[in-house]
């Protein structure tokens, strides 16, 4: 039997929804409950959280496992009696020293820098709590880097690599793969359980919650804080800033759209060479065989690995192209004031945010493939010129979607009502 929550003695406050800009009266949810916007169904507050102490212990466990997950062999290739190891760091380093430093740096950001930084920042939050420090910048950085933590994507890349190299030699799994799997699972768990809204509330409790007011309200999108317009502060250039996180508040819609268009168009330009040029090459007994994104999918199909072919096609071709098409449609809806189904438009935007990061799968596979075989042996993997353009396209489209403000769609919807 479902227990009905008791809101008799609850304290309500007004918040502006970051999804549709509606003003909603909400109370602090209890454990297992959450408050959502009645218009766009965006989650406004959640009572499901783990304590910061528990999250910091998970983060500490991640840092302890990181050297084993990143620096030690995960896979081994037995090629004519010679054992060749593949690790995360070895793949990135080999890619960098062989002239693909920009591509290696993009992989380093997503596979090493961001996961390590994420765990360190969570520990810094716990230290700040013990020392009674206000960690404004730490909280902001945690929110910024969460979409770029891609350990789960790298885990899938390992599985794809296993299928890809088994046609060339015998593949063995090393014991350190267990450390990598646990690190990926713990990172994903920490990603889900850490609640930034509650952390902001814990470190910066509201002195005067907005309960009822005819005065205009402001919303800071950086820390999701609703406050009275008269309480906003100003920086040295007399620009309005949030009284809690000191981020800029007022950004004109035209500037927001320019940022989205600039990064999206740049991503589209990068996607053409990414699909037309070879992304990888294999030297086998002196003969070079190069693959584009699509021919790589076809090679998996010819091997009979239909599921792997589907995964690679979905992550490397379908997701980037569909993400661009969806963003073009949403931008056109804002510019030309198209009033289509608002629920459908918001669902498309949520899908774009969710699947965008999985496009890095192909680059992670390339890094692992390069670390398995070194130059001068019978078989050798190389990175093609398309790898950089593909990585740049993924980065630019992810930035584009993060810059798109869903409230612009709702403004068009509200004008038509």
Sequence positions of predicted segments:
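Long C-terminal interaction/binding lobes of large macromolecular proteins
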Residues: 1-417
């Amino acid at each position: 039997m479902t227990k009905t929550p008791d809101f008799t003695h609850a304290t309500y406050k007004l918040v502006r929804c970051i999804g549709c800009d509606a003003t909603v009266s909400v109370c602090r949810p209890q454990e297992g409950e959450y408050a959502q916007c009645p218009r766009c169904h965006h989650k406004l507050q959640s009572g499901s959280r783990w304590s910061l102490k528990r999250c910091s212990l998970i983060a500490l466990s991640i840092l302890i496992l990181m050297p084993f997950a990143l620096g030690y062999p995960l896979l081994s290739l037995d090629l004519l009696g010679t054992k060749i190891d593949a690790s995360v760091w070895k793949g990135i380093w080999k890619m960098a020293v062989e002239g693909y430093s920009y591509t290696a740096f993009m992989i380093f950001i997503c596979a090493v820098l961001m996961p390590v930084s994420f765990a360190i920042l969570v520990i810094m939050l716990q230290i700040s709590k013990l020392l009674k420090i206000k960690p404004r910048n730490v909280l902001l950085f945690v929110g910024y880097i969460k979409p770029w933590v891609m350990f789960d994507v790298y885990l899938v890349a390992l599985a794809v690599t296993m299928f890809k190299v088994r046609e060339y030699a015998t593949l063995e799994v090393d014991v350190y793969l267990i450390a990598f799997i646990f690190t990926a699972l713990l990172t994903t768990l920490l990603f889900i359980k850490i609640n930034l809204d509650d952390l902001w509330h814990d470190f910066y409790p509201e002195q005067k919650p907005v309960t009822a007011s005819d005065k205009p309200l402001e919303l800071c999108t950086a820390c999701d804080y609703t406050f009275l317009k008269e309480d906003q502060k100003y920086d040295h250039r007399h620009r309005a800033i949030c009284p809690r996180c000191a981020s800029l508040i007022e950004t004109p819609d035209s500037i927001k759209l320019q940022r989205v268009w600039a990064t999206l168009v740049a991503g589209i330009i990068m996607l053409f060479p990414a699909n037309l040029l070879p992304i990888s090459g294999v030297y086998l007994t002196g003969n070079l065989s190069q693959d584009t994104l699509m021919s790589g999918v076809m090679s998996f199909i010819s091997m009979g690995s239909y599921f792997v072919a589907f995964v690679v096609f979905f992550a490397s071709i379908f997701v980037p192209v569909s993400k661009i098409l969806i963003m073009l449609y949403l931008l056109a809806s804002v510019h030309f004031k198209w009033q289509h189904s608002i629920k459908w438009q918001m669902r498309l935007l949520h899908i774009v945010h969710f699947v965008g990061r999985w496009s890095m799968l192909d680059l992670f596979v390339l890094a692992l493939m390069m670390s398995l075989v070194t130059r001068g042996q019978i078989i050798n993997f190389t990175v093609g010129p398309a790898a950089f353009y593909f990585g740049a396209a993924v980065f630019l489209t992810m930035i584009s979607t993060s810059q798109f403000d869903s409230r612009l769609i709702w403004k068009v919807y509200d004008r038509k009502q």
